[in-house]
Each structure stands twice: as C-alpha cells, then as structure tokens.
Amino acid sequence: YKEEDFSNIVIQSSDNFNAMGLDLYRLLASSDALITDYSSVFYDFMLMNRPIAFTVDDYEEYKDGRGFAVEDPDYYRAGPKIQTIEDLFSFITQVSNGKDEWQEKREKVNLEVNYYRDFKNCKRALKIGGVEL
C-alpha cells in the first residue's frame, strides 16, 4: 500500500467536529464506510447498512477500565477489527472495490439492535414518557 493512495482520507475527532460546528450525523449520512472504536455511533451507522471497521488497539484496557455496555461486544461489532496499518489499508481497499464480507452479519445485528426502523421512535419515546401527541 502507498500512503498517497489514501490521501483523500480525513481523520477527525469529536473536538474537531465541535470546533468547526459540524454535525456528525450529516457526515455519516454521506460516508461510504465508518472506522470507529467503542462508540455507540456504529449502531446508528448500521441503519444504512454500510461497511464498518473497528479499532481495537486498547481493547483490554477499555474492558478492564470503563467496561462495555454489553456482555459480548464482539458479537455486535459486525466488521473487521483493525489492529495494524495493513488491516486499515485492507479495509479501505475492500470498501473502494465494493467488497463487503460483513454485510450479512451486519444485517443480522441491525435487526436486533435497531428493532424499530419505521421513523417513529421519537413518538414512542414521548409515549413512554407520558406525552401524547
């Protein structure tokens, strides 16, 4: 892999987004794929059924420290785990070539974690809170 082949990749942090007044979800909507850590944003991105990869460089530290919200986080992370620069370049190359080995698993997990996909979740949340429209 040559670094110049990936010159169009931009790495951003939450602080950068906030400082520039950007909306993460608008960016996600126009993204072909997502590379993330343990943030729950991938559950939202999964609704678009696009490739997701996960960085796992501090897995043990995170597990032993803050911990995960689910017992088996790897079950829900339907995408490759990036541990090396080669893994990163491989994922980007696969996305660029339209290859998606994780689509079936992602669809299965999406059905579990995003049960309602009818755009009425706000209405349901208000009803649970005792607010009727």
Show where each model-derived region lies.
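Short secondary-structure boundary segments
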Residues: 1-4, 106, 119-122
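Donor nucleotide-activated moiety binding/catalytic core segment of transferases
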Residues: 1-43
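Catalytic binding pocket for nucleotide-activated donors in carbohydrate/polymer assembly enzymes
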Residues: 4-10, 40-113
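Short N-terminal micro-motifs specific to bacterial/archaeal maturation
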Residues: 18, 36, 78-79, 116
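Soluble or luminal CAZymes and related metallo-dependent hydrolases
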Residues: 23, 80, 117, 121
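C-terminal alpha-helical cap of glycosyltransferases
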Residues: 117-133
